[in-house]
Swiss-Prot record:
Similarity comment: family membership: Belongs to the gasdermin family.
Single annotated GO MF: phosphatidylinositol-4-phosphate binding
Coiled-coil residue windows: none
Post-translational modification, as annotated: Cleavage by CASP8 relieves autoinhibition by releasing the N-terminal moiety (Gasdermin-C, N-terminal) that initiates pyroptosis.
UniProtKB keywords: Cell membrane, Cytoplasm, Lipoprotein, Membrane, Necrosis, Palmitate, Transmembrane, Transmembrane beta strand
Domains (record comment): Intramolecular interactions between N- and C-terminal domains are important for autoinhibition in the absence of activation signal. The intrinsic pyroptosis-inducing activity is carried by the N-terminal domain.
Name of the protein: Gasdermin-C
Cited InterPro entries: Gasdermin (IPR007677), Gasdermin_pore (IPR040460), Gasdermin_PUB (IPR041263)
Region of interest called Triggers pyroptosis, as start-end residue ranges on this chain: 1-237
Pfam families named in the record: Gasdermin, Gasdermin_C
GO cellular component: cytoplasm; cytosol; plasma membrane
One annotated GO biological process: pyroptotic inflammatory response
């Protein structure tokens, strides 16, 4: 049992309880979220979040020199500790033809961390004072960097890191497990006597986190207009990074999202008809997923096979999934080994139907997968191998559709006809998937309670199961 870097950073965010505080998902990215580093976001869904991607540049690198930089405030070190331990013990009686006896088993797991973090931040008051005195925060360099142009053409919003929580000293996250089996038997027929034995195994895993690694961060949106750059201080202000940019030159992904957003969000119902807002109406999630399924179905069988067969082995390594997302979001089809490399090879071929954005489809799947935990990804891999995706999708749909619009807890009962095809191991795997989304599931009970916190991961799971089932049917 091991606490991963992802789990540590998420746990730290919960402990700090800071508004708009976000965890860093991968240890390899822990040095890419420094103050003033620029992030971009390329969401593929209206219903689940995408991760922030570092573009590899700092705000200080795209602005003209000699502008005043607000002084950073550093907090006092904050010690954070979390230790968990679990122990199971069982005794088993054995009755056989030639022997009677018993066996005992003990299984112990423990994991945790003991770290110290400090905050480096620029208060909003300092940023606001600077912008009030000087207008926009700074002028862009005359030679605009290529990533700024690419984001402008794709209408991607850019953000700047304004606060980080970093580790103050080298730390090791440790997890250990041990199994102890022992038994004794009386041999009663062929040989008179007693036999006994014992078997032990201990495993220890270590994850070093170096001093300076960033566990969590806060960000603010950038607004770039008339060759100047400003930081949007209010999260409620509705403004894009590149205001006034029209649709010319938009990527196919952006065009797809624009069509989806325009047709769903800007739709005005006829007079006298009341309709739910997009985020409260399940039919809009269903339309979004249906659109992705239709596009996947238009791909050749060979391309669909490549995507499905190479996604499966990647589910055991969320770091690889995250690295692939970063590469695709930055439009850098570089080198990766293994299954991720084969998917990149398929993208380089550009052999899919011209009007289908294969990269956008893969990003949609990857972003949905990253909403799930590592445990859920393992369970999903087992579901793919057992070919129970269709049954799971219908079960998830039966939960989402009637409860999607409710912000409060509502008891519900899973439909017996949907549970029937998921007997034994398949049902156990499905229940664990649902528990990972935030639903309270009991092994021998179809009853549960709707929780608003489960809405986003369930929406992501619904999209994943629908798209993967389409790939299975190819």
């Amino acid at each position: 049992m091991l606490y991963t870097f992802d789990q540590v950073s998420k746990d730290v965010v919960k402990k700090l309880q800071g508004k708009d505080l976000r965890p860093v998902r991968c240890l390899s990215d822990a040095t890419k979220f420094r103050q003033f580093d620029i992030l971009q976001k390329t969401p593929q869904s209206l219903f689940f979040k995408s991760e922030d991607t570092p573009v590899g540049y700092s705000l200080l690198q795209i602005l003209e020199p000699n502008f005043p930089v607000p002084e950073t405030e550093v907090s006092a070190p904050m010690p954070l500790k979390h230790i968990t331990s679990q122990k199971w013990k069982a005794d088993v009686d054995v009755k056989a033809t030639i022997a009677d006896g018993g066996a005992s088993a003990e299984f112990v797991q423990s994991c945790g961390y003991d770290i110290e973090v400090q905050s480096r931040s620029i208060p909003d008051s300092k940023l606001e004072s600077l912008q009030n005195r000087q207008g926009p925060w700074g002028k862009l360099l005359d030679k605009k960097l290529s990533f700024v142009t690419d984001c402008q053409m794709g209408r991607n919003n850019l953000y700047v890191v304004t606060e980080v929580f970093e580790v103050t000293k080298d730390t090791v996250v440790q997890g250990s497990s041990s199994i102890d089996l022992s038994g004794k038997a009386l041999v009663s027929q062929l040989v008179k006597g007693e036999a006994q034995g014992q078997w032990q195994r201990e495993t220890t895993d270590l994850v070093p986190i170096p001093k300076g690694a960033v566990l969590a961060y806060k960000k603010k949106q950038l607004v770039i207009e008339n060759n100047t750059c400003a930081i949007l201080l209010s999260a409620n202000a509705k403004k894009k990074t590149f205001p006034g940019i029209f649709n010319f030159g938009m990527s196919s992904r952006s065009q797809t999202m624009e069509i989806v957003n325009s047709s769903w969000i800007d739709y005005i119902p006829p007079i006298g008809r009341i309709e739910e807002p997009v985020h409260l109406d399940f039919k809009y999630l269903e339309k979004e997923v249906f659109l992705r399924k239709e596009q996947l179905a238009m791909l050749s069988k060979d391309v669909q096979d490549v995507v499905f067969s190479n996604l499966l082995p990647m589910l055991s390594d969320s770091d690889v999934l995250f690295d692939l997302i970063n590469m695709l979001e930055l439009d850098q089809l570089g080198h990766m080994d293994g299954p991720a490399g084969l998917i990149l090879d398929e993208l380089r071929k550009n052999s899919s139907t011209p009007w289908i954005d294969l990269k956008g489809l893969i990003l949609y799947l990857l972003q949905a997968l990253m909403v799930l935990s590592d445990t859920q990804l393992d369970l999903l891999a087992q579901s793919m191998e057992m070919r129970i995706l269709l049954q799971q999708r219908e079960l998830v749909r039966s939960i989402l559709e009637p409860n999607f619009k409710y912000p409060w807890n509502i008891p519900f009962t899973l439909q017996p006809q949907l549970l029937a095809p998921l007997q034994g191991e398949g049902l156990a795997i499905t229940y664990e998937l649902l528990k990972g989304c935030g639903l309270k599931m009991e092994p021998n009970s179809p009853r549960s309670t709707w929780d608003l916190e489960a809405k986003m991961p369930l929406s992501a799971l619904y999209g994943i199961l629908s798209c993967l089932q389409q790939l299975v049917e190819a």
